[in-house]
Amino acid sequence: MKLSVLLALGASSLAAAAPAATACDCGAAVTDRLLFSSSISTFQAARNALNPPCCDWSSDNCSSSPDKPRGYDFIPSCQRHDYGYRNGKRLNRFTEDYRKKVDDNFKADLYNYCSQFSGLESWKGVECRRYADIYYFFVRECGDGDCP
């Protein structure tokens, strides 16, 4: 009897000493930091780690558009754009102003990607930005689900 009481007390004290589970934070501040303030590589690292796990990390990459038009890898930019839309909706923040901000960030991400082409490859940067402009146009026209 004494042994079972000691074991029960020991087990309960171990449970009390264990850290309490913390609530996952994927609120507006975290979402905005990953979306608007972090580099695309920092965003991708968080996405690959699914950190924080309560964010909606799902993505269909560049939807029905090619993920890599003419070899330009737009996937990370498309994934961050999806993150903005999905988590904006999840947090009930998805207004037209918010959508425009996410879309503008998408264009900036694409242009930043295109800026890697310089010197003898500067023509690729020009071509890449033209594709970026097309992708931006379509998210503005069709991103709300109302495509002509």
Swiss-Prot record:
Organism superkingdom: Eukaryota
Entry keyword set: Calcium, Disulfide bond, Glycoprotein, Hydrolase, Lipid degradation, Lipid metabolism, Metal-binding, Secreted, Signal, Virulence
Protein name: Secretory phospholipase A2
Function: Secretory phospholipase that catalyzes the calcium-dependent hydrolysis of the 2-acyl groups in 3-sn-phosphoglycerides. Increases the ability to utilize host-derived nutrients and lipids, and promotes lipid dropplets accumulation. Plays a role in virulence.
Organism of derivation: Arthroderma benhamiae (strain ATCC MYA-4681 / CBS 112371)
Pfam families per the UniProt record, alphabetical: Phospholip_A2_3 (PF09056)
Entry cofactors: Ca(2+)
Glycosylation sites: N61
Assigned EC number: 3.1.1.4
Signal peptide positions (record): 1-23
A cellular component annotation (GO) from this entry: extracellular region
InterPro entries: PLipase_A2_dom_sf, PLipase_A2_prok/fun
